[in-house]
């Protein structure tokens, strides 16, 4: 099995050989069961089987093979082979000491090996990061300014060079007349100086310049033009000016300009001039020295200079033979260039070639070389295997060291933009321990921080804002630097982080406190290395334990290291939080004893040679294991039964409640039968057989080798299971089965049928299938319910009879009945997929048009709507799932099971009916023109109510916020389930490209996906298939809308206290009372509760378009450009004229209403609501002027949320209800039911947002308006709850909602009793409820601060 098992081979050799032989026959293999485990131990032991040779069924004990080992999780596991089933089955048996101890050591060795590999990987990663950071530090390090010291030699050389250059330029000479001349001595005997000096260069240049100017004006096309042009070149390429500029430049910028000064001086004296400077990049050090020597000799004798340069060239050829090829080639090339320019200068002197011609020649040569020849700047010296040994430059410009200052001009370029991220600023707290300070955050009901922060403390101090409390350390992770603390009661309102679905490389966010309690946020790139996350952040003390989150705010790791600049974190996943289980006193004592034993073992192992491990196992722990076995045998729960004690005993009925509790529950209204049912449910769920048996449980024997292997073989291979026991038995009890599950229960589609089955009973199988199909089709409707005239019990009895008959037929033919066969697991249907790698074309908004195919048959599209075609989409259409939550059995039964509400279920007809919300009445075709007074007043109120939207901004599409866990729409649903997956794969590239494409003039048609909403509805609506439809657009289209409207939406959410719209409000902490008091302060005599029916579906298009135009007009002027205006009009047009895709793939068009899936549905409904209220007030008061309407509106106020409205008005007509219902129908085509309009003189009794207003103790407090709907969502939910904690939390939410109800309210009392019952359930499990709230806490939650004595 593994190297340890091959060497040690614990147990019986016979059992090992037999076990290996049986392993080949087994359906599951030991290689899979004990993969990665330590050494195995084989042995023989008994197993109880049915005796096949007895007429009456009896139990016979056989010998079988037992195998045991320690698995990777350090669990000692035992399996034995079960004949007949041919399978290794896990069981219990006594522990084989050597196997257990060696196995633990093996697993510990593997864990240490993995840890070492992890540390090596981390070390390698840290070394790489250190090198990168060191390089970055050197690049970014601010260099101190260099103060060049004063060098007299440099200044002296520069002065001499300038004097030499100006001396040559000025050509100054004094003139005079010689009156006596000695021809023999060639000397003037008498010379008379003139009084003035002539400046040769000044006069000649001025004269030549004037001559050139005059001749150019007169003779621009003459032959003499080229002559004057040559004079211009002579001026431009003058050596003295070039040399002077070069000297000044090197004097100002170069660190050591002496080399250049010497070259310029020698070039001036020797008349080499520009030649000497031009060839410097081609010369190495020896060639440069040769050039200087040649120029010095050239000044004295040109012929000797040629000879000297040639000798130096020959000498370098001979001496350089010992050098490397690359260096030798560069040196020879440099000296050859020196010899060439010496010869060239001599020829230029003889032919009297002007210096400017030489300069022009050199400039042309360099220009030609730059433009047409690209010589290599470096040579790579490689070995025979291609490895680069070193690199040498082809132009050894050793003087380039003087121009190193150019490198300071290099700047780093920004190559990326940090993404925007979501943080939870109040989601972290400060943890203070004896060993230091850190940061912690909440996950579920735990506070999480680094293990090194809490150290060895059992309790630490937590500071969250102004609140301080002590938290108990409950868990320290064994391998990760993570510690968990219990959440204190005072911190229950602290926001909790959620886990990320995937942890990948990319942008991460760190939110932490430093040691000065300052909130710090960092966004950077993170790289995952196995169980760690590495990143570069300037971390500080106190940041340990901070959450590392994605840009969506989901936690992925816990910050743990602080090196001053680099940061590291340990990955944090849900599996790192242990399951909480209360440890009994007996288990704690046993655990302490085992730890004591392990400590003794570790002490002994420090002195043992690794080669003597077997002796260590046998000798070192033999005494301690005997003591431990004796103690375990003396414990009642762990003691073994004596051999033969196999009779089971009847369990004792355990009392659930005390007598006082039982009487108290009777007084609360429970009947005795209800309490008996609840007690049985508690016993069935939490009954522990081990604790209730009156006799000792049977154990398994120690390992032993049987004496005769022949007996074992006879027992094994002569065994057959008794066929009589497999005979199907006909049950007299009919199990109540839901009609929608009949096919799954009685059909044979999910059972394996062999060839032998078909040969034996093919006719019977065919008859059975036909009978089952006929019964189900005639008894069950298409929506999965019993038909009205069907007796369900009779049908189920008939089906059970057929099921028993077909199974008994198989048994009679010697075939395995279906009741003994394993049903095939129904795999979920795979959705149709698109191309494997969608490109930018598939992600465009109008790509769906390429997938449309023609179709004429309507299925889900209503008759009056067009069918444009179908796309390849096959999604579930019907939903008859009404979940049955087993956890609800823990709750008491309500007084009335018929609540009038139930979960929405639907068939195909519900889709057709959902379109009726668009068709109530036709609005006036031109409301603005036919009602100008009302329209003008409504528009005036609209601007006044939403004046704070002025100068709103257009956001970048990558900075918008939207629920990314929503559907990506069609056709992106082919490749991604949510927009988050789409963004993770493609990023924002498609968003930006589509934005630019539409801004550039493209106008694609957007497809909306339609589905029905699963929610609690009135039973009458469910029966009438009146289900709400939701439509969602492509996420790119939705985020384009967010660009224009997200800033305005956020502004409206921040002004719920002073304005009408209440999207974003909170009724807690006095919020409900504050808003009602705001309306009461107006002092109006009239209060109106108003509600539309099918509000958003009947909004007239002209009203909706006017609201959208108003929103665009409130943007800042810089955003109201023609291209953005046209783009916004395209966005609005795609909302009003929508291409809708049904789950069947059908495509139709909707022309009315505000779709309930766009990003601003509620905000737009609020704007429309305000506009309609103002129009309504002006319409119902035709006698008032515009000034009077404005004055009345000062005392008019409302609270609105979509179509919900609570209004206080200074005046209401007598026939208000009749007139307002008619107005909305005739003018706007909207549906207002008279019973949905209530007029009152007090707000008490009216409702808003599902709350009825009450007045208690001087405050307006809310109570639930539909208690039956809330109770139905508890007892008949739309989906199952995860566990008891979720059920308790849901009950607690209802407890908060009904806090303000009267004490005799039935719904309130039911929730209180249910919470008490759940507390009993927790108590019976030895646990405490996860939450607890008091009356004073709820009073403060609803009423607010201490001014009402509730703070």
Swiss-Prot record:
Annotated site residues (Cleavage) in this chain: 172-173, 407-408, 640-641, 721-722, 826-827
Gene Ontology biological-process annotations: DNA-templated transcription; proteolysis; viral RNA genome replication; viral translational frameshifting
EC number: 3.4.21.-, 2.7.7.48
Alphabetical keyword list: ATP-binding, Coiled coil, Covalent protein-RNA linkage, Host membrane, Hydrolase, Membrane, Nucleotide-binding, Nucleotidyltransferase, Phosphoprotein, Protease, RNA-directed RNA polymerase, Serine protease, Transferase, Transmembrane, Transmembrane helix, Viral RNA replication
Domain of life assignment: Viruses
PTM annotation, UniProt: Cleaved by the viral and host proteases. The protease is probably autocatalytically cleaved.
Single GO molecular function: ATP binding
Composition bias, Basic and acidic residues: 833-842
Gene Ontology, cellular component aspect: host cell membrane; membrane
Record's catalysed reaction(s): RNA(n) + a ribonucleoside 5'-triphosphate = RNA(n+1) + diphosphate
Domain RdRp catalytic: residue ranges: 1085-1217
Biased composition regions of type Acidic residues, renumbered to the chain: 687-699
Transmembrane regions listed in the UniProt entry: 153-173, 231-251, 257-277, 304-324, 337-357
Cited PROSITE patterns: RDRP_SSRNA_POS (PS50507)
Family under the similarity heading: Belongs to the astroviridae polyprotein 1AB family.
Protein name according to UniProt: Non-structural polyprotein 1AB
Organism the protein comes from: Ovine astrovirus 1 (OAstV-1)
Gene for this chain: ORF1
């Amino acid at each position: 099995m593994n190297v340890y098992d091959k060497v040690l081979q614990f147990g019986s050799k016979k059992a090992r050989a037999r076990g290996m032989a049986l392993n080949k026959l087994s359906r599951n293999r030991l290689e899979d069961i004990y993969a990665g485990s330590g050494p195995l131990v084989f042995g023989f032991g008994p197993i109880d089987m049915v005796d096949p040779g007895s007429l009456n069924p009896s139990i016979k004990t056989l010998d079988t093979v037992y195998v045991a080992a320690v698995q990777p999780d350090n669990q000692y596991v035992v399996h034995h082979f079960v004949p007949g089933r041919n399978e290794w089955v896990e069981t219990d048996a006594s522990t084989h000491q050597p196997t257990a101890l060696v196995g633990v050591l093996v697993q510990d060795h593997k864990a240490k090996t993995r840890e070492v590999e992890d540390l090596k990987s981390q070390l390698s990663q840290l070394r790489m990061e250190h090198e990168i950071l060191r390089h970055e530090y050197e690049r970014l390090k601010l260099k101190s300014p260099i103060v060049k010291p004063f060098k007299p030699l440099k200044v002296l050389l520069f002065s001499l060079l300038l004097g030499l250059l100006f001396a040559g330029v000025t050509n100054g000479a004094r003139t005079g007349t010689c009156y006596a001349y000695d021809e023999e001595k060639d000397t003037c005997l008498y010379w008379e100086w003139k009084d003035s000096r002539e400046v040769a260069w000044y006069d000649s240049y001025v004269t030549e310049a004037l001559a050139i100017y005059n001749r150019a004006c007169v003779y621009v096309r003459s032959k003499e033009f080229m002559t004057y042009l040559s004079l211009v070149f002579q001026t431009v390429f003058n050596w003295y000016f070039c040399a002077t500029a070069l000297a000044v430049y090197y004097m100002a910028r170069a660190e050591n300009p002496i080399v250049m000064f010497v070259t310029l001086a020698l070039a001036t004296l020797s008349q080499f001039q520009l030649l000497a400077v031009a060839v410097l990049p081609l010369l190495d050090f020896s060639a440069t020295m040769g050039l200087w020597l040649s120029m010095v000799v050239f000044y004295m004798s040109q012929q000797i200079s040629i000879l000297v340069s040639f000798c130096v060239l020959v000498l370098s050829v001979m001496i350089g033979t010992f050098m490397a090829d690359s260096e030798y080639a560069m040196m020879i090339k440099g000296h050859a260039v020196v010899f060439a320019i010496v010869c060239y200068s001599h020829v230029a002197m003889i032919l009297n070639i002007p210096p400017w011609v030489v300069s022009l020649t050199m400039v042309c040569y360099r220009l030609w070389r730059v433009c047409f020849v690209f010589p290599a700047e470096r040579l790579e010296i490689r070995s025979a295997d291609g490895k680069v040994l070193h690199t040498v430059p082809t132009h050894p410009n050793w003087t380039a060291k003087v121009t190193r200052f150019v490198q300071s001009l290099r700047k780093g370029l920004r190559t990326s933009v940090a993404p925007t991220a979501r943080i939870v600023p109040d989601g972290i707290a400060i943890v203070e321990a004896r060993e230091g300070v850190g940061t912690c955050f909440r996950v579920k009901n735990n506070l999480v921080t680094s293990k090194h922060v809490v150290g060895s403390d059992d309790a630490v101090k937590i500071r969250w804002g102004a609140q301080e409390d002590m938290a108990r350390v409950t868990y320290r992770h064994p391998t990760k630097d993570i510690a968990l603390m219990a959440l204190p009661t005072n911190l229950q309102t602290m926001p909790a982080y959620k886990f990320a679905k995937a942890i990948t490389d990319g942008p991460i966010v760190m939110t932490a406190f430093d040691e000065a309690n300052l909130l710090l946020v960092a966004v950077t790139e993170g790289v995952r290395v196995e169980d760690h996350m590495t990143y570069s952040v300037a971390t500080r003390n106190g940041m340990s334990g901070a959450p590392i989150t994605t840009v969506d705010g989901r936690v992925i790791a816990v910050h743990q290291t602080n090196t001053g600049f680099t940061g590291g974190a340990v990955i944090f996943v849900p599996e790192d939080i242990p399951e909480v289980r209360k440890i009994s006193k007996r288990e704690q004592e046993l655990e302490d004893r085992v730890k004591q034993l392990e400590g003794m073992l570790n002490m002994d192992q420090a002195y043992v040679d690794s080669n003597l491990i077997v002796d260590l196992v046998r000798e070192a722990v033999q005494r301690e294991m005997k003591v431990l076995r004796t103690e375990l045998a003396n414990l009642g729960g762990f003691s073994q039964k004596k051999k033969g004690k196999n009779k089971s005993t009847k369990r004792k009925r355990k009392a659930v409640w005390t007598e006082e509790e039982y009487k108290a529950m009777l007084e609360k209204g429970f009947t005795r039968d209800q309490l008996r049912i609840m007690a049985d449910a508690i016993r069935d769920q939490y009954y522990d057989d081990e604790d209730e048996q009156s006799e000792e449980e049977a154990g398994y024997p120690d390992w032993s080798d049987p004496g005769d292997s022949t007996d074992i073989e006879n027992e094994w291979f002569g065994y057959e299971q008794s066929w009589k026991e497999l005979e199907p038995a006909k049950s007299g009890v009919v199990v109540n089965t839901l009609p929608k599950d009949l096919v799954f229960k009685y059909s044979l589609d999910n059972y394996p049928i062999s060839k032998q089955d078909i040969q034996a009973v093919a006719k019977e199988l065919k008859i059975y299938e036909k009978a089952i199909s006929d019964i189900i089709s005639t008894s069950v409707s298409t929506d999965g319910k019993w038909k009205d005239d069907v007796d369900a019990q009779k049908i189920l009895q008939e089906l059970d009879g057929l099921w028993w008959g077909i199974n008994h037929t198989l048994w009679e033919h010697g075939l395995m009945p279906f009741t003994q066969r394993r049903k095939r697991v129904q795999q979920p249907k795979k959705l149709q997929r698109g191309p494997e790698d969608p490109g930018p074309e598939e992600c465009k908004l109008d790509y769906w048009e390429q997938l449309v195919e023609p179709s004429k048959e309507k299925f889900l599209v209503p008759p009056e709507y067009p069918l444009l075609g179908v796309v390849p989409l096959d999604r579930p259409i019907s939903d008859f799932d009404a979940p049955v939550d087993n956890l609800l059995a823990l709750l008491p039964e309500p007084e009335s099971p018929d609540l009038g509400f139930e979960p929405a279920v639907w068939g195909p007809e519900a889709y057709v009916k959902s379109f009726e919300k668009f068709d109530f009445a036709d609005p006036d075709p031109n409301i603005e023109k036919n009602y100008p007074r009302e329209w003008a007043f409504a528009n005036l109120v609209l601007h006044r109510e939403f004046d704070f939207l002025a100068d709103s901004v257009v956001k970048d599409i990558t900075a918008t916020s939207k629920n990314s866990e929503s559907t990506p729409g069609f056709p992106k649903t082919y490749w991604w389930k949510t927009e988050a997956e789409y963004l993770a794969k493609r990023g924002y590239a498609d968003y930006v490209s589509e934005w630019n494409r539409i801004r550039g003039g493209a106008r694609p048609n957007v497809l909306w996906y339609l589905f029905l909403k699963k929610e609690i509805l009135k039973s009458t609506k469910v029966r009438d298939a009146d289900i709400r439809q939701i439509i969602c657009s492509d996420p790119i289209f939705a985020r384009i809308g967010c660009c224009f409207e997200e800033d305005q939406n956020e502004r409206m959410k921040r002004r719920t206290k002073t304005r009408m719209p209440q999207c974003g409000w909170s009724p807690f902490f006095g919020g409900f009372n504050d808003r009602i008091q705001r309306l009461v302060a107006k002092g109006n005599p009239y209060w109106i509760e108003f509600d539309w029916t099918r509000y958003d579906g009947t909004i007239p298009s002209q009203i909706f378009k006017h609201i959208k135009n108003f929103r665009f007009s409130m943007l800042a002027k810089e955003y109201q450009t023609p291209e953005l205006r046209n783009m916004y009009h395209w966005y609005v047009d795609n909302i009003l004229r929508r291409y809708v895709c049904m789950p069947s793939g059908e495509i139709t068009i909707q022309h009315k209403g505000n779709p309930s899936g766009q990003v601003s549905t509620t905000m737009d409904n609020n704007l429309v609501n305000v506009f309609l209220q103002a129009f309504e007030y002006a319409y119902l008061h035709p006698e008032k002027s515009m000034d009077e309407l404005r004055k009345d509106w000062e005392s008019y106020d409302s609270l609105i949320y979509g179509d919900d409205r609570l209004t206080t008005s200074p005046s209401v007509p007598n026939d208000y209800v009749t007139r307002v219902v008619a107005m909305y129908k005739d003018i706007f085509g909207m549906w207002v039911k008279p019973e949905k309009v209530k007029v009152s003189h007090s707000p008490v009794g009216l409702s808003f947002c599902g709350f009825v207003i009450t007045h208690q103790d001087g405050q307006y407090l809310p109570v639930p308006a539909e208690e039956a709907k809330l109770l139905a969502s508890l007892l008949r939910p739309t989906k199952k709850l995860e566990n008891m904690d979720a059920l308790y939390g849901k009950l607690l939410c209802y407890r908060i909602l009904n806090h303000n109800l009267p004490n005799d309210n039935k719904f309130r009392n039911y929730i209180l009793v249910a919470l008490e019952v759940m507390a009993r359930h927790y108590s019976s499990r030895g646990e405490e409820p996860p939450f607890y709230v008091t009356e004073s806490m709820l009073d403060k939650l609803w009423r607010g601060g201490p001014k009402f004595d509730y703070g």
